[in-house]
């Protein structure tokens, strides 16, 4: 029983990472109905920015988190302005293909400059372990992940619900043209949404580096897809849904490994996506919306 509880703790730590990345997917889709498949590579960029901050600039983990957050936010704005804004009036297929192209560009550019091999993430943070009860324990890295994730989720909910920019984001999500007629800077809102989602992905990248002590230029592919599954599971476009979906995927992966089927954990996640699209296409918190074509 205690071993099972320990796996649940581990699953919540992994799920926190998926939740942070899934929030970026769901915010962008909720605002402009775009699946930003380059988002996983922004997460990878965040990990390498954190690596540079810790290894070269000799910063501590907390400062590295802030640096990754700011740089990835700027990167998100650049990607939106250069790659997506010119295609805003184009078909969704064109935007989707562009997103895949941006993903390949970031991944291959990083592989060219830094190589495709894994790099050890230098962090001595969180080596201490705290016993909860019996043989169930939590380490400093997991506490960092839980603390940062909960704080960011609370901050995000506050921004979306109670700030002027958050209200503008919700208005653009409902009707972009009506929001523009009401005087809302739609371009600014969309850029802010990309910046916010990219900042969360950058922080997730640093947290993964701290947790697993290794990063690579291809790390964004699988994790990005799983975070997308989490967003779909929770109901893409729903912020609470992305949070719940991330934790559910993390727990599912951990339980699959716990029962001895670790080689199949990725397949189980993708099979879950298949089932969701058939049984519950709107996700757990999504709404079925009819569109006229």
Annotate each PLM feature.
Residues 1-21, 49, 61-64, 90-94, ...:
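Membrane-interfacial amphipathic/re-entrant helices at transmembrane-helix boundaries
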Residues 9, 31-78, 82, 87, ...:
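Membrane-embedded helix boundary and interhelical linker motif in transport proteins
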Residues 14, 136-215, 239, 244-245:
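Helix-loop-helix "hairpin" substructures at the membrane interface of multi-pass membrane proteins
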Residues 18, 58-70, 191-201, 205-271:
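Transmembrane alpha-helical segments in multi-pass inner-membrane proteins
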Residues 47-52, 68-75, 102-108, 146-157, ...:
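Hydrophobic core segments of alpha-helical transmembrane domains in multi-pass membrane transport
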Residues 58-102, 109, 244-249, 280-281:
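Alpha-helical transmembrane segments within multi-pass membrane transporters and channels
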Residues 82, 113, 174-188, 260-293:
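Cytosolic-side transmembrane-helix boundaries in multi-pass membrane proteins
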Residues 87, 92-162, 189, 255, ...:
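Transmembrane helix-bundle core of multi-pass membrane transporters
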């Amino acid at each position: 029983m205690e071993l099972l509880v320990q796996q649940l703790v581990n699953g919540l730590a992994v799920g926190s990472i998926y939740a942070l990345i899934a929030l970026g997917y769901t915010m962008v889709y909720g605002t402009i109905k775009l699946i930003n498949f380059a988002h996983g590579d922004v997460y990878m960029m965040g990990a390498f920015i954190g690596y540079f901050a810790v290894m070269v600039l000799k910063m501590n983990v907390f400062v590295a988190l802030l640096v990754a957050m700011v740089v990835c936010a700027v990167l998100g704005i650049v990607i939106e302005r250069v790659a997506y804004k010119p295609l805003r009036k184009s078909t969704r297929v064109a935007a989707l293909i562009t997103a895949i192209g941006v993903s390949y560009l970031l991944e291959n550019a990083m592989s060219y400059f830094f190589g495709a091999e894994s790099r050890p993430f230098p962090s001595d943070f969180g080596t201490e372990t705290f016993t909860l009860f019996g043989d169930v324990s939590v380490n400093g890295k997991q506490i960092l992940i839980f603390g940062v994730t909960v704080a960011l989720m609370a901050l995000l909910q506050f921004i979306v619900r109670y700030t002027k920019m958050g209200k503008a984001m919700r208005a653009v999500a409902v009707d972009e043209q009506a929001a523009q007629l009401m005087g809302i800077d739609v371009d600014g809102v969309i850029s802010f949404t990309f910046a916010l989602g990219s900042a969360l992905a950058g922080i997730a990248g640093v947290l993964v580096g701290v947790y697993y002590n290794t990063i690579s230029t291809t790390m964004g592919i699988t994790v990005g897809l799983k975070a997308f599954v989490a967003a779909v599971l929770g109901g893409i476009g729903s912020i609470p849904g992305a949070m719940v979906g991330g934790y559910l995927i993390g727990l599912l992966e951990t339980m699959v490994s716990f029962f001895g089927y670790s080689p199949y954990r990725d397949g189980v996640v993708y099979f879950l996506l298949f089932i969701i699209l058939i049984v519950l296409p709107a996700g757990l918190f999504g709404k079925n919306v009819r569109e006229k074509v």
